[in-house]
Amino acid sequence: MPSLRDIRTRIGSVRSTRQITKAMKMVSAAKLRRAQDAVLKTRPYAMLLDQTLSRLAARAAAEEQVAHPLLAPRAQRTAEVVVVTSDRGLAGGFNSNICRFVQRFLTENADRFERIALATVGKKGREYFKARNLPIRRDYTGIHANLAYEKAEALAREATERYLAGEVDAVFLAYNEFKSAISQKQAVVQLLPVDTSAASADTAGVDFRYEPSREALLADLLPRHVAMQVWRALLESAASEHGARMSAMESATKNAEEMIASLSLQYNRARQAYVTKELSEIVSGAEAL
């Protein structure tokens, strides 16, 4: 049976842990609010950009015009999956869920492509796939440290250049899509070639006057679209990470409080037993006299 000193030490240790998890929960809650605001502000712009591109591509296809290289379909032999994870842990199943989701995607598409490589954003994804001897072509570091649109733009530019050079035939983006503070949905979306199949059925029947031209707009908007897809994935992942960490720390804090209550009860019982024993010894000694 542990001594009173041992129990007191454990209670102090658990209390220190509770202070840490409670502080981390509060920090994550503050970061979540900012990240959630950024996601909600980005979604309408991304959706409108998708609709505009779909309309432009649909009209170009209807008039049998030459499509932009980022739209033109081609034989897909090689692919790359850009996996967005976090640099830090203590976020529940946030990282493991998306990594396992990507593993299933690789298995399901093994016959579709001759070769599928990985590019990781975040230390946890790199560690996960490296431990399983999966090929990692590129590890993007320092993106989460100071999240900025310019970093997403640089990543998108590199992916676009490799696609146009024929080094890869398809690029996918895997990330946790933010639903709520306690819910994230794993997603793998096609980044390149740009998918405009979301165009509505009556899009081809509606046209606008474009200046300077439809082709010039496509050439300008397509790179923006790719960069926006990457930026949105980074923001969605950041919000999901903070939500997952907040939930994990809330659960850890609750468990710590329950453990403190259990240890306190154990301490009181042990102390009561110790006092009873001391009293019994005193009474026995008095009777002996």
Curated annotation (Swiss-Prot):
- On whether Membrane is a keyword of this UniProt record, the answer is yes
- Keywords, comma-separated and alphabetical: ATP synthesis, Cell inner membrane, Cell membrane, CF(1), Hydrogen ion transport, Ion transport, Membrane, Transport
Its gene name is: atpG
Q: What does it do?
A: Produces ATP from ADP in the presence of a proton gradient across the membrane. The gamma chain is believed to be important in regulating ATPase activity and the flow of protons through the CF(0) complex.
Q: Which HAMAP family match?
A: ATP_synth_gamma_bact
InterPro entries from the UniProt entry: ATP_synth_F1_ATPase_gsu, ATP_synth_F1_gsu, ATP_synth_F1_gsu_CS
Q: Subunit details for this protein?
A: F-type ATPases have 2 components, CF(1) - the catalytic core - and CF(0) - the membrane proton channel. CF(1) has five subunits: alpha(3), beta(3), gamma(1), delta(1), epsilon(1). CF(0) has three main subunits: a, b and c.
Compartments in which it is found: Cell inner membrane
UniProt topology in membrane: Peripheral membrane protein
PANTHER family assigned: ATP SYNTHASE GAMMA CHAIN, ATP SYNTHASE SUBUNIT GAMMA, MITOCHONDRIAL
Tell me where on the tree of life, at the top rank, the source sits: Bacteria
Any one Pfam family here would be ATP-synt
Query: Can you name this protein?
Result: ATP synthase gamma chain
Instruction: Give a GO cellular-component term.
Output: plasma membrane
